[in-house]
Amino acid sequence: MIVRSFSDIENTDRHVKAASGTWESKRIVLAKEKVGFSLHETVLYAGTETSMWYANHIEAVLCTEGEAELTNDETGETHWITPGTMYLLDGHERHTMRPKTDFRCVCVFNPPVTGREDHDENGVYPLLTEEA
């Protein structure tokens, strides 16, 4: 059994701050735990815009605080995401988040991330392994 709190993660290598300056993420469960998924709490900052494309991962996101506009960049469809709303990127959709307020969410990734990932120039997380 693993028990881990946010205070255990803050200011460690599990507390990732994006090079873009638009978000930070506490990586709670990672690939090295070998449970088949990773679990993160992520905050996207108010007034920013983050374009993403999880070409190598499936992501489920549950908003716990704040508000943001989610745009499916492939269809142009937009959704207003508020606390209690979930979205699932089951088709590797390119998407953009525009938080109106600081937007806090819980994210699950499959395959699990290692904790070292950040979005590349295409908004993609590279597919890293624990051996990499």
Curated annotation (Swiss-Prot):
<dbReference type="InterPro" id="IPR011051">
    <property type="entry name" value="RmlC_Cupin_sf"/>
</dbReference>
<dbReference type="InterPro" id="IPR010462">
    <property type="entry name" value="Ectoine_synth"/>
</dbReference>
<comment type="pathway">
    <text>Amine and polyamine biosynthesis; ectoine biosynthesis; L-ectoine from L-aspartate 4-semialdehyde: step 3/3.</text>
</comment>
<comment type="function">
    <text>Catalyzes the circularization of gamma-N-acetyl-alpha,gamma-diaminobutyric acid (ADABA) to ectoine (1,4,5,6-tetrahydro-2-methyl-4-pyrimidine carboxylic acid), which is an excellent osmoprotectant.</text>
</comment>
<comment type="similarity">
    <text>Belongs to the ectoine synthase family.</text>
</comment>
<dbReference type="GO" id="GO:0033990">
    <property type="term" value="F:ectoine synthase activity"/>
</dbReference>
<dbReference type="Pfam" id="PF06339">
    <property type="entry name" value="Ectoine_synth"/>
</dbReference>
<dbReference type="InterPro" id="IPR014710">
    <property type="entry name" value="RmlC-like_jellyroll"/>
</dbReference>
<keyword id="KW-0456">Lyase</keyword>
<protein>
    <recommendedName>
        <fullName>L-ectoine synthase</fullName>
        <ecNumber>4.2.1.108</ecNumber>
    </recommendedName>
</protein>
<dbReference type="GO" id="GO:0019491">
    <property type="term" value="P:ectoine biosynthetic process"/>
</dbReference>
